[in-house]
Amino acid sequence: MKAALLTLAVLFLTGSQARHFWQQDEPQSPWDRVKDLATVYVDAVKDSGRDYVAQFEASALGKQLNLKLLDNWDSLSSTVTKLREQIGPVTQEFWDNLEKETEVLRQEMSKDLEEVKQKVQPYLDDFQKKWQEEVELYRQKVAPLGSELREGARQKLQELQEKLSPLAEELRDRARTHVDALRAQLAPYSDDLRERLAARLEALKEGGGASLAEYHARASEQLSALGEKARPALEDLRQGLLPVLESFKVSLLAAIDEATKKLNAQ
């Protein structure tokens, strides 16, 4: 989880120009990437939810209750889609403003990250080379044992496992040694990057350009504006949900009443 969060943080701070792996489009903005991820997630939830509703309505209990959940679900999905279309331009404007306000900080951090990357790359290459050598050495040691197993009888399996165990432990110990060495080599650069980030933030705090207080004030203003502009769309969503909820309530009460009558008649 920490690695995923760090990757996302670096991605947004550096304004990475990654492309879709299935397309050769122009580089996406951070907002476009966030919007695409959110759209895929919402659509997946909506589709899976509709499948569950359809399965319930097709069941014996669903047919007996006849709640018409699928119709209500489609109405709700349509309302949510409309809300997303209305809020889209508003959130786009908010993200554009935020991206503009942090442009200088992102550029400076991008330079710092690239410089640190160039410094640590030799250590990473050396680690990869040593790891490949260790794996190849392990493969060479294990190969004869595999031949013994193919040529020998089933009872030699236990003997083979006993021979493989120390080799696997040796590979693990040697790998741990290389990892510890790499961690020690990279530690100064990690500290350097952390100090640089702290220095950038301190410079902002002391007034080198826009101060952190100004950033906070601007972000608060933009969030307030976002709330004001999104309020009509949210009200439309509420109004759109009312008939859906009312229809569901009527269907549910009718189903309960029908079930009560059947129980009383027995």
Curated annotation (Swiss-Prot):
Oligomer status and interactors: Homodimer. Interacts with APOA1BP and CLU. Component of a sperm activating protein complex (SPAP), consisting of APOA1, an immunoglobulin heavy chain, an immunoglobulin light chain and albumin. Interacts with NDRG1. Interacts with SCGB3A2. Interacts with NAXE and YJEFN3.
Name the UniProt record assigns to this protein: Apolipoprotein A-I
Post-translational modification: Palmitoylated. Glycosylated.
Keyword Lipid metabolism appears in the UniProt entry: yes
InterPro entries, alphabetized: ApoA_E, Apolipoprotein_A1/A4/E
Compartmental location: Secreted
Cystine crosslinks: none
Function text: Participates in the reverse transport of cholesterol from tissues to the liver for excretion by promoting cholesterol efflux from tissues and by acting as a cofactor for the lecithin cholesterol acyltransferase (LCAT). As part of the SPAP complex, activates spermatozoa motility.
Sequence repeat extents: 67-88, 89-110, 111-121, 122-143, 144-165, 166-187, 188-209, 210-231, 232-242, 243-266
Pfam families xrefs: Apolipoprotein
Top-level taxon: Eukaryota
Residues passing through the membrane, by range: none
PANTHER family: APOLIPOPROTEIN (PTHR18976), APOLIPOPROTEIN A-I (PTHR18976:SF11)
Cleaved signal peptide residues: 1-18
Region (10 X approximate tandem repeats): 67-266
Major localisation: secreted
Protein family (similarity comment): Belongs to the apolipoprotein A1/A4/E family.
Tissue expression pattern: Major protein of plasma HDL, also found in chylomicrons. Synthesized in the liver and small intestine.
